[in-house]
Every structure is written in C-alpha cells, then in structure tokens.
C-alpha cells in the first residue's frame, strides 16, 4: 500500500517511506535520513548551552574557521585531493568536502574511482577513527569532514594521516 499511495501534500523527509516509487528499506536498516529525531531535542539544548559557555556564536565561528583551515591547508598541499567546490567564496567552513585526483586515481575506471572514498571511509570506520564522513549519496564521490565548532582542530589534524594511510593502502 505504501508503494501505491501518493499524498497530495508534501511529506517531511522523516515520514517518507518510499523513494522512486518503491519502499525505501534502507531507512529500516539504519540509513541516515538527515532529519533530526524529536528525541534529539535535549542534545540540541545541551549543545546550545555548551556553545554559549565557550563564547557563543563568535567563538563557534572562530572554531569552525580554524578547523576548516586545518583541512583546507592539507587539501591545498596534497596533490591527490582537491576541494569539491572550486570557488573558495562558495565553500563552507563546516562540512568540508573533497574529491580524489592524480595519476593513480585517474588510471582507475569510473566505477573504481567512485568506490575510492567509500573504501577509505570503511577502512577508517573499521579502525574506529571516524564515522559518517563519506560523501553525500547524491554528491560526487567524496569525503565530507565535519569542521564545525563542535570539534577540535587537533582531532581533524589527527584524522589527516589516517586518510593518507588509507589512500596509500588502496594503491598497493
């Protein structure tokens, strides 16, 4: 019945149970649907209180800028990656996305290239290094690193060698 019923009004993403006319089983298997649960309200309140305690919005912006700089400096210095957004004026300082490039990467088939970010993500997740940083499903194959004010620059700096390690492992 879910597959045959189309409401006349738009549904919030949280309540959409089908995609492309078929039931979306991924949402029942733990896939992220990018809609916050109402159960997360207390987490938002705690985060807002924490943000206020460190200096409010100006401090959070400063932290996000510092975090993005750590990752962006690495991207700009690393020949096998590039920022997914070419125009620096259009880049975000929170969800920094980058794609792979270079001689080895370019020698791969299109399908193999598309698999590289996901393989790196899975390798690092298996090591307990990071979670939920694979690129968006509908974006070009990429990695997406959270650089918002809620993380420490040192943690982003610690992640970078792991990405380098995983990329090197894939080339073996």
Features from the language model and the residues they span:
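Active-site C-terminal subdomain of aminotransferase-like
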Residues: 1-74, 87
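Surface-exposed helix-capping loop/turn segments at secondary-structure junctions
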Residues: 54-56, 78-84, 171-172
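Conserved C-terminal alpha-helix-loop-beta "cap" of PLP-dependent enzymes
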Residues: 76, 80-154, 158
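A common structural junction motif
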Residues: 124-131, 163-171
């Amino acid at each position: 019945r879910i597959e045959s019923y189309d409401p006349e009004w738009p549904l919030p993403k949280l309540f959409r149970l089908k995609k492309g006319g078929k039931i979306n089983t991924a949402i029942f298997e733990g896939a992220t649907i990018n809609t916050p649960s109402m159960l997360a309200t207390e987490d938002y309140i705690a985060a807002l209180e924490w943000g206020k305690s460190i200096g409010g919005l100006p401090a959070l912006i400063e932290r996000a800028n510092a975090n993005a700089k750590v990752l962006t400096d690495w991207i700009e210095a690393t020949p096998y990656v590039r920022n997914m957004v070419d125009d620096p004026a259009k880049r975000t300082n929170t969800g920094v996305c980058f794609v792979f490039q270079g001689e080895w990467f370019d020698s791969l088939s299109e399908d193999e290239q598309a698999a590289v970010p996901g393989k790196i993500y899975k390798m690092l997740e298996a090591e307990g290094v990071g979670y939920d940083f694979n690129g968006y499903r509908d974006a070009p194959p990429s990695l997406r690193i959270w650089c918002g004010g809620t993380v420490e620059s040192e943690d982003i700096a610690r992640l970078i060698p792991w990405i380098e390690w995983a990329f090197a492992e894939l080339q073996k």
